[in-house]
Structure formats: C-alpha cells, structure tokens
Amino acid sequence: MAHKKGQGSTQNNRDSIGRRLGVKKFGGEFVRAGNIIIRQRGTATHAGNNVGMGKDHTIFALIDGFVKFERKDKNRKKVSVYPA
C-alpha cells in the first residue's frame, strides 16, 4: 500500500515576491522628465498635464516640474506635473 505520509508541511511556505507598486514621487516633490511618479496595475490614477502613461499603466513625468495630485471628477484621481 503506497501511501504518502508526512508531506503536509513541505508543500507550504511559498509566496510570490512583492511587485514594488505604488507612489514613487509625492505631491509637491520636484521631478525631472522621465521620472516615474506612480507604478500601478490598471488606471487607479489617471494621467493629467505633462505626464505620460506606459503600457503597464506606469505614470511618468514628461517635463521637469512639481507633482500635483488632483481630482479628475467625483470618483477619479489624476496626477499632473507643473513647471517650476
């Protein structure tokens, strides 16, 4: 009778590593063109003025300036960069 015994704990203790998502540059912070402002999955925050969005929804600065988080409408946020 081939039974497997004592294998329970060897199948546990696996987890995926964190994806390092989130806000990288906060409101009022100075950024240079190309700096990443937010890494996100989907468009939790939308691109505003002077920022671009990558194919993985990463928001980055297109010009040198200061980051400003704003409301796009009642339930959507956007982030913009304004020149110094």
UniProtKB/Swiss-Prot annotation:
Protein name: Large ribosomal subunit protein bL27
GO annotation terms (biological process): translation
Family under the similarity heading: Belongs to the bacterial ribosomal protein bL27 family.
SUPFAM superfamilies: Ribosomal L27 protein-like
Superkingdom of source: Bacteria
Database matches in NCBIfam families: L27
Gene3D superfamilies for the chain: 2.40.50.100
Keywords: Ribonucleoprotein, Ribosomal protein
Gene that this polypeptide is encoded by: rpmA
Keyword Acyltransferase carried by entry: no
Matching PROSITE patterns: RIBOSOMAL_L27
GO cellular component: cytosolic large ribosomal subunit
InterPro entries per the UniProt record, alphabetical: Ribosomal_bL27, Ribosomal_bL27_CS
A molecular-function term among this protein's GO annotations: structural constituent of ribosome
